[in-house]
Amino acid sequence: YQRLSGISISHLYNLRASTTYQQQRRHYTKTQPTKKNTIGERRKPRPQGKPGYIRIDSVHQGDQDGVKGLYHINAVDEVTQWQVIFTVERISEQFMIPALEVMLDAFPFTLIGFHADNGSEYINKSVVKLLNKLHIELTKSRSRQTNDNALAESKNASTVRKILGYCHIPQHFAPQVNAFNQQYMVPYLNFHRPCFFPTTVIDNKGKERKKYRYEDMKTPYDKLKSLDNAKQYLKKGITFKKRA
């Protein structure tokens, strides 16, 4: 302790970021695949430029010294990149179903598709019942097709991890973290944080290539509003408000 007292705060952060510290103190739980079942169709969604096809994934905030960490549920629309994040204590049905109900309602446009990896927190009868009630189709990632849920996984790193970090957060802080998400993080991501949107071009060999240009950057709100006849996609009672 005498030696530690002389170490600067910045160096303590460096030590905590080391591989040795991470291996000794922290453990991250990966999504557990379900056993082979017929729930959900294995295919990549094809929205054809229409919003309403969301990708969803779970982010674990790590275990430390035997204490379980909380989980973030991250849902992203493929076309507009509209993003909704919800934090729960655990990914059991008790917490997941109420969270998913709130998240699905939070999207301003009508939802058509719900795509997940093969995690048991999404591929189960309770989620199917919820989606059927809302007339939303469930699809799941194909075997050995790592790009099927790439959008949600990339947003895990570029938004959830970037803002909330990798450090362990105990489960009992889930309500406070979720309050931060709903009040600050979700509005920031959708109304203030620009995203790259690809433009498809044909190269000299006749192959399609995606280009990410700065002039095509938009916030999810602006991207939604820029769609042809965008009002047709909005849920009943929701309108585009003029922003100052």
State each model region's role.
Residues Y1-G113, N118-T146, A150-A244:
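Secondary-structure boundary/capping micro-motif
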